[in-house]
Regions:
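A short, conserved structural fragment
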Residues: 53-63
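Basic amphipathic alpha-helical segments that dock to polyanions
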Residues: 34, 45-55
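Short alpha-helical segments that sit at the start of domains
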Residues: 1-17
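Short acidic, hydrophobic short linear motifs in intrinsically disordered regions
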Residues: 25-35
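Short coil turns linking two alpha-helices in DNA-binding domains
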Residues: 41-42
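C-terminal regulatory/oligomerization modules of transcriptional regulators
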Residues: 104-137
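Basic, amphipathic "hinge/linker" alpha-helix immediately C-terminal to the N-terminal HTH DNA-binding motif
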Residues: 63-81
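Pre-recognition alpha-helix immediately N-terminal to the DNA-recognition helix
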Residues: 13-21, 73, 84
Length: 137
């Protein structure tokens, strides 16, 4: 995913990550579930999904949404960066929930290769503070 061509917003990031975590169970997600989880109205969620669809990151059909191959890769990269920086923040003494919140504010802005450098500096943890795997190592 080229950073300039497919730059995403924080709201789009939140939506991508939620869809990845939900659909990892193998099922598409309903638009109203996305709206409810993101605490936005359905038209707002619809607009976010449309933007993600235009960027080739999701497919939407009959109110059901799933990630495309490109969307899965984008979400995977975001989660690698997120879990890396969450680990760094916790190792630096920031409480876990605050570390997660802070990582969510920047994880979609940092290239994966930079996160991998940070990962090496913090001794390559296998999982984030929540116990979720830091993929792709």
């Amino acid at each position: 995913m080229s950073q300039m061509a497919n730059a995403i917003t924080k709201r789009e990031r939140d939506c991508l990550v939620f869809i990845e975590e939900y659909t990892g169970k193998g099922f598409p997600i309903r638009l109203h579930e996305i709206a409810s989880t993101m605490k936005v109205k359905s038209p707002t969620a619809f607009n976010v999904i449309k933007r993600l669809e235009e960027k080739g990151l999701v497919e939407s059909r009959n109110g059901m949404v799933k990630l495309t191959t490109v969307g899965k890769e984008a979400a995977r990269k975001i989660l690698i960066v997120h879990r890396t920086f969450e680990s760094l923040f916790c190792q630096s003494g920031i409480p876990m929930e605050k570390a997660c919140e802070e990582a969510s504010d920047i994880d979609f802005l940092i290239p994966e290769n930079n996160a991998r450098k940070v990962l090496k500096r913090i001794d390559n943890p296998k999982v984030c503070p929540h116990g979720k795997p830091i993929w792709g190592r």
